[in-house]
């Protein structure tokens, strides 16, 4: 009975992440912030503020992190909601599990700022962060040795995954090569009129619906734009998918988004890329953000941490001198 009640409480909480035709935009944003914001960050994570590319960002630094590993987290919220405050607790847990700093940009939201405003903001953040991390790596490199490339992770959930893919599709190879992992939670991958989700009648999803998709897409951009890869990543051509960074997709078994994720993972693999689809039995959309109710939330983030850090662990045994320096951080130095 207690487990069943916890599940109901988790579903009630997670539904506040979705925006549908019956929602009021101001109420949607307010309820999300009231529910998910926190005064104290978990695991002694320290927060500082910084502008990357003139975009306000949070930088979350755990007690121990790899000095050349940094994550850009592109939050969900149906393109119309979400903020640094909403995602601080969740991203603090990610920072701890992945031994890295996490940057949360406060990008512009629809409908006041439709596509491509959010994409442009994230591109500006990425360019500025990439440049600063390169400079930092050069300054910390011993004379006569080659500077290490920064290890950048792109992570996102829901509608944020749409924006993340738009960023990746438009990056030059020199930038893509510095992205060690792409981590997508319950990604939105096809907002086009032909999307199976748009036309779904009976669904088992306890959080998401076709109505959420339609309303979010309508506020985000024009109907014609939903047919392009920057808005519907699943529609990318093979050329855009080539040399895509190693990708980890995590989601629940009961999600309406699962079929699109399976198709996307298959296409990435067909184009010679690494992709793991991690599906959690009985779980729902963004179950990772209901950790006070679902034990699976903690286990899922543990797995993300192992995926992100496994390559570095492999390097330790082969080339000790290339092991990322671990440092204690009292505050972010970005």
Task: Report residues per predicted region.
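Short beta-strand-to-loop junctions in surface cap/lid or active-site-entrance loops
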Residues: 56-67, 236-241
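Short strand-loop-helix active-site module centered on a catalytic nucleophile
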Residues: 57, 72, 94, 115-191, ...
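Serine-hydrolase catalytic core
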Residues: 225-281, 299
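C-terminal catalytic histidine-bearing segment of alpha/beta-hydrolase fold enzymes
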Residues: 263-265, 269-330, 334
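Hydrolase active-site cap/lid region
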Residues: 169-227
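Short beta-strand element of the alpha/beta-hydrolase
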Residues: 68-77
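A glycine/proline-hinged amphipathic helix-loop "lid/cap" segment
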Residues: 1-63, 313-334
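Short amphipathic alpha-helix adjacent to the substrate-entry channel of hydrolases
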Residues: 85-104
């Amino acid at each position: 009975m207690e487990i069943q009640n916890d599940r109901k409480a988790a579903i009630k909480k997670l539904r506040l992440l979705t925006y549908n035709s019956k929602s009021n935009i101001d109420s949607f944003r307010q309820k999300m912030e009231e529910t998910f914001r926190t005064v104290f960050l978990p695991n002694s994570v320290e927060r500082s503020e910084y502008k990357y590319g003139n975009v306000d960002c949070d930088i979350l630094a755990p007690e121990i992190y790899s000095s050349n590993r940094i994550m850009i987290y592109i939050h969900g919220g149906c393109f119309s909601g979400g903020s640094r405050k909403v995602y601080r607790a969740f991203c603090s847990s990610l920072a701890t599990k992945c031994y890295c700093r996490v940057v949360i940009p406060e990008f512009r939201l629809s409908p006041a700022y439709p596509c491509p405003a959010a994409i442009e903001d994230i591109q500006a953040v990425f360019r500025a962060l990439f440049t600063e991390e390169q400079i930092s790596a050069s300054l910390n490199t011993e004379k006569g040795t080659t500077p290490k490339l920064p290890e950048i992770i792109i992570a996102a959930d829901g509608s944020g995954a749409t924006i993340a893919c738009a960023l990746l599709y438009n990056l030059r190879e020199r930038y893509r090569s510095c992205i060690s992992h792409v981590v997508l939670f319950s990604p939105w991958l096809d907002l086009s009129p032909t999307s199976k989700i748009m036309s779904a009648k009976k669904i088992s999803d306890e959080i998401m619906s076709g109505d959420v998709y339609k309303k979010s897409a309508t506020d985000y951009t024009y109907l014609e734009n939903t047919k392009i890869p920057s808005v519907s990543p699943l529609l990318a051509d093979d050329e855009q998918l080539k040399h895509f960074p190693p990708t980890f997709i995590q989601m629940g078994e009961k999600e309406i988004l699962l079929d699109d994720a399976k198709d996307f993972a298959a296409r990435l693999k067909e184009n010679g890329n690494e992709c793991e689809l991690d599906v959690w039995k009985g779980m729902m959309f963004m179950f990772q953000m209901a950790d006070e109710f679902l034990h699976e939330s903690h286990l899922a983030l543990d797995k993300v941490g192992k995926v992100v850090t496994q390559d570095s662990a492999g390097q330790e045994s082969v080339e000790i001198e290339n092991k990322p320096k671990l440092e204690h951080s009292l505050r972010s130095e970005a």
